[in-house]
Structures are given as structure tokens and as C-alpha cells.
């Protein structure tokens, strides 16, 4: 361990987030008191932060802020709740209750699929919070540990069951998720009215003050990188033999968030540290998490994530500590490769001779309007489907395990409701975070602007004869990384209302960070620059060269090799 760094950290004052966790009585705080408080629709003091451990964020409608302020009213507070759903798999019949709650008890009446393979409700009033938790509990779900300083929802390759390996990987995602869950009974006591039992509580893995920052985990089946593993703290890449997982390559320390103008923050790709046999999976997971728990920076949240811990102590020191704690020697990484990270749309037959239908849901927003009946269409499918829904890391949904007798029925519903539609490859490979009006951190539009922006970019691609090509395009309303723009070939990151930084030069499979090309420019200025770049790409690329690879080869931006040094240079 770097003793100099340890001394510097321990001499600094801990962040207020650490005080909140220390004093929370294992995440209870005074949340129950706030639930009884009818004077405000929000949570007060430390509870504002503590509810995140229970899977909720307090938000308000930013479109209404000025109006409500003029009326001397508090902001229209409501909660966003994120379900814990390892691997994104949910029985179709459970969707019926999810749809009902969204329609009856949320302000917006929609369901949002996320790029972490789960769903969110936006606009839940405080008075309805217990109802949503009890509804989730009734169908075997919860929202524990989907936010704040814990291991978040565990991702898993979501392409349909083409082999037994897919089911095995999903089971590992579930095991890891359950293994790393908080042990506190606070969630059940507060939201499910379970009686408190007087015991001495402990958190054997996470500790009393939990982790220094959020922590993200994936289970991956090559050659598909649909989970964007390089953006995550801890990754298990399946190595198989005779249709069975025999072990995992381990990659650690990925993450994309940074702070505008703060050169001590930077994105970083997850790094290989070795291979383990499958029986060592949970012990290695525990070792990685507890090393980050103990070594992570609790004095500066901007430098508290795993990638900064590894940078501060060195990868070799971090690796040695993992091996020591797990009592496992990491072996050399086994060969693997990736060919894509997009979803494969349409029908695919699985190993049981059933079918899976992958549907494109732009930005993951499930709603009905005059042109799209996504919400009612999925509800109709859920009513007749005996299998699962699988939410993908690209914010889409798979109707899986469809029997031959139901295939035509489901296809007719999907067609009539617009769930099966003709979209360009550009649109199908795009993504945006939620941003306005509900995200308090948003600096610029993301979800609400993306569709219109893509339409203009589609026209440019059509003009230059590349309309059928794939370009990975992503938009984030701020630099926190939720839209994973910093693993895109074209990434927009909000700077202020109507203005973005334009990043280019990522690649198709998601293992190269793009670099800033233009700063603080408008949508029209972005389109002007992209028009020139796409025209040049169309005329000068070699052998069907991908857009991001062309950008780097022609040196429109320099390749980001070590982001610690060259992300900002």
C-alpha cells in the first residue's frame, strides 16, 4: 500500500456523505419520520441522501421550477425509483403490476428502461412510496442498492438464450448481486412494515459506512459487449468449454464520469488483472469490493471511485491485495474478443426451440401517444406471454421464450403498436440519459432532444450515401456518464442549456474513449461539424472503415491511450 497516499487521505477531513452513513443506523436515518411529515412532499436533511440506498432519488420537475417559485410553492417534489433486476430478466406476468403502478401512481404514467438493465418509475409522490415497494415485494422484486455507495444492479449479456452458457451467466449475475447486497434490515422495516428485531447489525462486506462511491459490476459472454464492460468497476468475462463456464477473466477499474474543467477527474477503461476458475468467483468479488471499501478515498468524492484508487496505489498493489484477501492467485488472462455491443433486433430461435423478439425502444421510454403505443402494446403482450421480458443494456427489451403458437400473436401486437418499426442503424445504436425535466444534475437536454437530432443526422448520412452504416451515438445531459457518451463514436455531453461538448473517436466495440473535438457548441454547430466529418469519412474511408476508426486514423483527434494524461491534453 502507498503509505504516503494513505497518510494524506487519513489526515484530510471525511466528506459529509461519510458522516451521513456513519450516523444513519445502517441506512435508517429518520426516513420514517419524513414519511409522516405532510408539510413537505420531499425528504429532509440526511434522508435526502439516505433514500438513495433504498433505490430512490428525490427529484422535481424543472420545467415547473420558475412557475412554482413565483407562486411561492416548493418545487414539485417526486421520487424516481429504480428496481433491482440483475441481468434484466423479469417474468412477463409481473409486468402487469409494473404497468398498473406506472399508470395509476406516477405523475408521468411512463416506464423508463435504463442502460443498466432495469426499469425506473419517475414521478412517485411521497405518499405512494410504500405502495410501490410493497407492489415490488409482491412480485419478488425490490429496489435495494440500486443507487448510492453500494454495488449497483449487476449487468449480464442479454442476448437471447442461444446456449446454456447464457442462463449460467445470468445465474452468476444474480448470485453476485445477492452476495454483495447490504445486510441491513432497514429496507424491510421502513417500506414493508416488517417488525424490527433487536440484534447487533453488521455489514460484513460493505461495512458500516458502505463503499466510498458507487460500484458497478458486469457478467459478460464474448463476443458481445452489450453491457459496455469497460465502463464498470468489476467485470467477469466468461471463459467456456463444452458449453459450460469454467472461469472468468477479471477486469477492474472502469468508469466514465468526470467534472467539467477538473483535470483530476477522467474516464478510464476497465483493465485486465487475470483469470480465475469459476469456484473462486464470489471470493474474488468480495476481495475486490472490500479492497475498494478500505482503500478508496473517503475525503474527496470526485476521486473516490475504483479507478482513482487503482491509480493512487498502483494496479500491481491493488492486484496483490485482491489475491491476498481472496487467497487466490490470479492466472494469465485467457483469450477472448468482442465483435459488437448492439442488440440484434427481430426474431431469434433459442436452444429450446422457442423464440425471442428484440424490440427497439428509443431511449428506453415506454409510453403511449398518437403515433406509438409502446406501453399498451407491451401490456397486451404481457397478458398472453408465458415467458420473460429481458431488458438490455441498450435500453431495449427482449420478449423471450416465446412458444411457436404465440409467435404470430405477439408479432401482430408488436406491429400494430409500433414496437416493430423501421429505424436506421444510427437510431438503433443511439442512447441518451433522462436529463430534463427530472434529473437535478442535467445541464442540457438529452432524451428529449435525441430523436430530433438523429433525424437531422440521418439526412446528412443519406446525402453522403452512408445511411445504412452504424455509428454509435450517445448523449449525456451532464458529465456524470449515465448515457455512456464517453464510449461512443460520437458523444455529446451537456455543458449548458442548448450547448454541448462534442467528443469523437470512440469505436464500435466500446474499448476506446473518444476525445473532445469542439467545446460548448450548439446543436446546429454540432451538426455542421458532423456534416463535414461524415462527408470526409464517406469519401476517404478504407475498406468499410468504421467512423470512429477513421476519425483516429485521420487524426481529427488524437487517440486516447492513457486518459489520466491525454484525456485533457
Swiss-Prot record:
Gene3D superfamilies, alphabetized: Sulfite Reductase Hemoprotein, domain 1 (3.30.413.10)
GO CC list: sulfite reductase complex (NADPH)
UniProt GO molecular function: 4 iron, 4 sulfur cluster binding; heme binding; metal ion binding; NADP binding; sulfite reductase (ferredoxin) activity; sulfite reductase (NADPH) activity
Catalyses which reaction(s): hydrogen sulfide + 3 NADP(+) + 3 H2O = sulfite + 3 NADPH + 4 H(+)
Main EC class the enzyme belongs to: oxidoreductase
Pathway assigned to this chain's UniProt record: Sulfur metabolism; hydrogen sulfide biosynthesis; hydrogen sulfide from sulfite (NADPH route): step 1/1
Protein name: Sulfite reductase [NADPH] hemoprotein beta-component
Organism whose genome encodes this protein: Buchnera aphidicola subsp. Acyrthosiphon pisum (strain Tuc7)
Amino acid at each position: 500500500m502507498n503509505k504516503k497516499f494513505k497518510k494524506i487521505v487519513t489526515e484530510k477531513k471525511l466528506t459529509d456523505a461519510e458522516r451521513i452513513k456513519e450516523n444513519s443506523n445502517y441506512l435508517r436515518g429518520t426516513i420514517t419520520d419524513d414519511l409522516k411529515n405532510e408539510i413537505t412532499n420531499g425528504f429532509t436533511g440526511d434522508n435526502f441522501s439516505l433514500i438513495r440506498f433504498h433505490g430512490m432519488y428525490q427529484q422535481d420537475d424543472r420545467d415547473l421550477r420558475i412557475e412554482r417559485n413565483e407562486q411561492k410553492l416548493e418545487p414539485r417534489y417526486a421520487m424516481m425509483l429504480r428496481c433491482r433486476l440483475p441481468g434484466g430478466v423479469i417474468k412477463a406476468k409481473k409486468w402487469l403490476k409494473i404497468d398498473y403502478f406506472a399508470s395509476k401512481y406516477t405523475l408521468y404514467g411512463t416506464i423508463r428502461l435504463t442502460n443498466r438493465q432495469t426499469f425506473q418509475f419517475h414521478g412517485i409522490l411521497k405518499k405512494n412510496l410504500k405502495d410501490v415497494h410493497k407492489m415490488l415485494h409482491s412480485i419478488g422484486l425490490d429496489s435495494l442498492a440500486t443507487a448510492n455507495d453500494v454495488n449497483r444492479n449487476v449487468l449480464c449479456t442479454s442476448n437471447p438464450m442461444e446456449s446454456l452458457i447464457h442462463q449460467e451467466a445470468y445465474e452468476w449475475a444474480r448470485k453476485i448481486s445477492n452476495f454483495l447486497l447490504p445486510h441491513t434490515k432497514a429496507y424491510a422495516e421502513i417500506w414493508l412494515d416488517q417488525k424490527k428485531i433487536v440484534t447487533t447489525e453488521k455489514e460484513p462486506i460493505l461495512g458500516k459506512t458502505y463503499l466510498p462511491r458507487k460500484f458497478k459490476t458486469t457478467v459478460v459472454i464474448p463476443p458481445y459487449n452489450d453491457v459496455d464492460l469497460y465502463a464498470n468497476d468489476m467485470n467477469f468475462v466468461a471463459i467456456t468449454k463444452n458449453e459450460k463456464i469454467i472461469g472468468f477473466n477479471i477486469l477492474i477499474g472502469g468508469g466514465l464520469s468526470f467534472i467539467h474543467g477538473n483535470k483530476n477527474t477522467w474516464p478510464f477503461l476497465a483493465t485486465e488483472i487475470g483469470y480465475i476458475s469459476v469456484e473462486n468467483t464470489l471470493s474474488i468479488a468480495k476481495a475486490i469490493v472490500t479492497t475498494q471499501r478500505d482503500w478508496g478515498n473517503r475525503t474527496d468524492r470526485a476521486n473516490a471511485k475504483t479507478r482513482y484508487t487503482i491509480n493512487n496505489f498502483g494496479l500491481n498493489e491493488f492486484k496483490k491485495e485482491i489475491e491476498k484477501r481472496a487467497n487466490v492467485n490470479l492466472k494469465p488472462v485467457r483469450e477472448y474478443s468482442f465483435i459488437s455491443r448492439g442488440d440484434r433486433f427481430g426474431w431469434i430461435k433459442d436452444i429450446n426451440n422457442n423464440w425471442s423478439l428484440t424490440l427497439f425502444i428509443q431511449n428506453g421510454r415506454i409510453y403511449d401517444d398518437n403515433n406509438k403505443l409502446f406501453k399498451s402494446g407491451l401490456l397486451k403482450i404481457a397478458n398472453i406471454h408465458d415467458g420473460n421480458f429481458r431488458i438490455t443494456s441498450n435500453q431495449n427489451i427482449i420478449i423471450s421464450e416465446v412458444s411457436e403458437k404465440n409467435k404470430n400473436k405477439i408479432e401482430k401486437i408488436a406491429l400494430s403498436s409500433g414496437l416493430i418499426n423501421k429505424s436506421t442503424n444510427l437510431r438503433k445504436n443511439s442512447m441518451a440519459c433522462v436529463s430534463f425535466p427530472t434529473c437535478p444534475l442535467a445541464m442540457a437536454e438529452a432524451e428529449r432532444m435525441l430523436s430530433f437530432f438523429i433525424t437531422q443526422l440521418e439526412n446528412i448520412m443519406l446525402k453522403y450515401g452512408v445511411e445504412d452504416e452504424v455509428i454509435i451515438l450517445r448523449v449525456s445531459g451532464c458529465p456524470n456518464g449515465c448515457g455512456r457518451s464517453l464510449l461512443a463514436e460520437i458523444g455529446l455531453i451537456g455543458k449548458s442549456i442548448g450547448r454541448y461538448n462534442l467528443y469523437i473517436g470512440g469505436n464500435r466495440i466500446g474499448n476506446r474513449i473518444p476525445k473532445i473535438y469542439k467545446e460548448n457548441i450548439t446543436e446546429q454547430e454540432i451538426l455542421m461539424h458532423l456534416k463535414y466529418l461524415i462527408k470526409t469519412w464517406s469519401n476517404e474511408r478504407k475498406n468499410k472503415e468504421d467512423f470512429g476508426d477513421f476519425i483516429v486514423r485521420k487524426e481529427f483527434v488524437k487517440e486516447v491511450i492513457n486518459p489520466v494524461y491525454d484525456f485533457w491534453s
